[in-house]
Design a protein with these regions (language model features):
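Histidine/acidic residue-rich metal-binding segments in metalloenzymes
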Residues: 128, 167-263, 277, 286-309, ...
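Alpha-helical scaffold segments that flank or form the walls of functional sites
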Residues: 86-139, 163-182
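Histidine/acidic-residue-rich catalytic or RNA/ligand-binding cores of hydrolases
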Residues: 81-84, 126, 195, 231-237, ...
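N-terminal metal-binding scaffold of metallo-dependent hydrolase/deaminase domains
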Residues: 1-52, 65-66, 371-377, 391
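His/Asp/Glu-enriched, well-ordered alpha-helical/loop segment
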Residues: 216, 286, 290-373
Length: 409
């Protein structure tokens, strides 16, 4: 043991009935993956992969499928919609948020997520966690983050850091970059329609100034923009990524496609009744349920428009499989949806040269699921093996879960 992580033999081979490599290619049957340290050095049929003597060999049951680690493209480390009145918990002390982030990250890892994009956190909890992972103090996914996300005081965003002016937002962006932010984020619109309209809390001039400030710092910029004029103003300003886009219209879809703008789909908050029931506001609970049909319709259009899309769980901890299932329900093939949640997600994070697919030279971020996701994509909920950087984490996570259960008795 080194820290909390089990270090495998220098070379490890995994044999599987099938491998879905994340590129969209036809799955390999009766296949093997060879890992040296934390790097994949070969992948192919068992006959084509030469396994050196002394290699540790993991042979998966015939009913399991080997895949790349999944990528959660929109996550808030300390947020969990499955906690009662969770919106009040975001105001807890930062030390408590950090502890909650540990639990959330462990659940996400166990669901097969090995890379995460964080879209607003308080107290630099995300950066502290990333440092703790790098130092071997905790186990966790690969993290790319905007650190704090900003909103105008008059605006929406319960995890947003409030600012009173564009100048204050510029200073906040600069502080984020100095602290270690990989990209930047601000909040523009609300989340649900109000009287059939989507409120926007920033003017076109303010949005343009914010986008320019981020780009001047050499960072891409993501925006919480759900629909309406606010989303169009973001596209006019040249944002790099739209988060959520629940009510994106046909014109916006065409503009996003033309500009190569990303859309990160986070369908769960409109469709997960368990999560919705934990909201304190009856009005918000009703709005989320009432607006489901329109969200399904608009996101289905976007998914089928050949946009650059990724998926995220937002605060629905451990539910990445639900987002992949939503893509399939909207018309994607299972193979395409898996690519979105692996290689495509890695492209969004800017790590596709090292993660997102099972290819030679990439990091050994590997999971297995019980079943064949090409026949039934919902089996992605049944994650067995979890490996990040060639280190097997599922056994540790299961042991920690057992200890937690014993402690609670």
């Amino acid at each position: 043991m080194v820290g909390l992580v089990t270090v495998l033999a220098m070379q490890t081979a995994i044999k599987a009935k099938r491998i879905v490599d994340g590129t969209g290619a036809v799955p390999l049957e009766n296949a093997a993956l060879l890992i040296d340290g934390n790097v994949i050095i070969d992948v192919g049929t068992e006959e084509s992969v030469r396994i050196p003597e002394g290699t540790e060999v993991i042979t998966l049951p015939d009913n399991e499928t080997l895949l790349p680690g999944l990528v959660d493209g929109h996550n808030h480390p300390s947020l969990c919609w499955y906690l009662k009145n969770f919106l009040t918990l975001v105001n807890d002390p930062h030390e408590h948020l950090f502890l909650r982030a540990i639990r959330n990250f462990h659940i996400n890892l166990r669901s097969g997520v090995t890379s995460i994009r964080c879209l607003a956190e308080k107290g630099y909890v995300d950066l502290l966690y990333r440092r703790a992972v790098e130092e071997g103090l905790v186990i966790g996914p690969r993290i790319k983050t905007c650190t704090r996300g900003f909103r105008f005081e008059r605006g929406h965003g319960f995890l947003g850091t409030p600012v009173q002016s564009v100048e204050e937002l510029r200073r906040g962006f600069a502080e984020n970059v100095k602290a270690g932010a990989d990209f930047l984020k601000f909040f523009v619109t609300g989340t649900v329609l109000v009287d059939r309209e989507m409120p926007s809390f920033m003017s076109q001039v303010e949005i343009q100034a914010a986008v320019d400030a981020a780009h001047d710092l050499g960072k891409e910029v993501a925006v919480h923009a759900v629909g309406g004029q606010g989303l169009h103003d973001c596209l006019s300003a040249g944002v790099d990524c739209i988060e959520h886009g629940y009510f994106v219209d046909d014109e916006a879809i065409a503009r996003m496609k033309g500009a190569g703008c990303w859309l990160v789909i986070t369908s769960g908050i409109f469709f997960d009744d368990e999560a919705i029931d934990n909201l304190h506001s009856r009005e918000l609970r009703e709005a989320l349920r009432e607006q489901r049909p329109l969200v399904r319709e608009t996101l289905t259009k976007a998914i089928n428009a050949d946009l650059k899309v990724a998926v995220g769980t937002d605060g629905l901890v451990g539910k990445i499989a639900d987002e992949i299932c939503f893509l399939v329900a909207a018309g994607m093939t299972s193979l395409e949806a898996i690519r979105v949640a692996t290689l495509q997600g890695a492209r969004l994070l800017g790590i596709d040269d090292e993660a997102g697919s099972l290819e030679r030279g990439k990091r050994a971020d590997v999971i297995s699921v019980v079943g064949n996701p090409l026949e039934d994509v919902s089996v992605l909920e049944n994650v067995h093996l979890v490996m990040k950087d060639g280190q097997r984490l599922d056994l540790i996570l299961d042991q920690m879960s057992t200890l937690d259960e014993r402690a609670m008795k």
